[in-house]
Amino acid sequence: VEHLKENREKCIDKNTLMSIIEYQHTGIIHSPFKDIKTPKSDKTRFEVLPMEFNRKEADVMAEIARLQVRIPGLHLHDAYQATSTGPLVPGCEICTRMKHMSFQLGFRCNADCPFCFLHTYRADIPDEDEKYNRQALIKEFHRRRDELEGVSLTGGEPLLHLPELEASVSEMRRYKPGLHFWVYTNGILADGERLGFLRALGIGEIRFNLAAMNYKKNILLNLERAREMFEYVVVEVPSYPKQKNELMGCLEELDRIGIDQLNLQELLVTDANVHRLEGEGYQSGFLFLKKFFLYGSRRMTYEVMRHCVEEGYSFTVNDCSASRFGTRG
């Protein structure tokens, strides 16, 4: 990686992107262009290949398009590659129109997800910066409020910040009564009391990240409780190849519960999680290779999507990737 950093300008001059290719758990380093078989005992988890920048971007997007055409009845939502198997819940509809803002209530969290792309802190550690962050976001809301249709309430874990959530929602609703709010949660604290608190605030949509606790049954029970209380219930998880089997194993249960939508996020690699993902083949070079495509994550999205269509599950499956904004990395 240091060698790549030192030679970055030289690579750009040659119109070449040095691509770090994902290591797959089968022992194959996969790229849309070639498969490189490596011994299971080989400790090298990535390989660097010279690749023309334009070819890489075009070829990967073409490969995603080929995955899409294998799935009948996909809905296209804008000029890019945002797709779903059915109609979107209101929060996602608003997002595709770029009419929403993300409101981070705090940085504290009670989970420790290896894939989390945000800087979060333990639930028992107070952080004065949280207050200043919320104040800055309220100012941003007032600057943009005329154009906004919805606000997503995130963290950290929002259910650790219920007083702040209530105050923030009340402030924004005072100036924009018709706003649609949706809350993200890892589901650990989603008991009847807290869910009832959110419903009483007029929250119309809740999203569970089941991957945070590796799809444990007690979180599925909390999800089922939420289904009885909210108009829109979404499961939103990263397409994380390491957890693919766990996700596939609970799809039938999600259909029984009656969720409205399964959002499959593209796995994001940032300075907050690269140290946890390095051992799985995701390398910190991603931070300066601006156009790297996490192809394995996108491929998993369409494999799961196709399976859900073939099984006839009632919920919409949505590809929530960076492509929906027409940009990458």
Q: Where on the chain are the PLM-derived regions?
A:
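Canonical Radical SAM [4Fe-4S] cluster-binding loop centered on the CxxxCxxC motif
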Residues: 90-132
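Core AdoMet radical
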Residues: 120-132, 144-161, 175-190, 201-219, ...
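Conserved N-terminal glycine/acidic-rich loop preference
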Residues: 82-93, 97, 114-115, 141, ...
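Conserved C-terminal portion of the radical SAM core fold
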Residues: 220-328
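Short, acidic/polar
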Residues: 134-138, 190-196, 244-251
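Flexible, acidic/Gly-rich N-terminal and inter-domain linker regions that tether
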Residues: 1-102, 111
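Distinct, well-ordered alpha-helical segments
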Residues: 163-170, 191-199, 218-222, 247
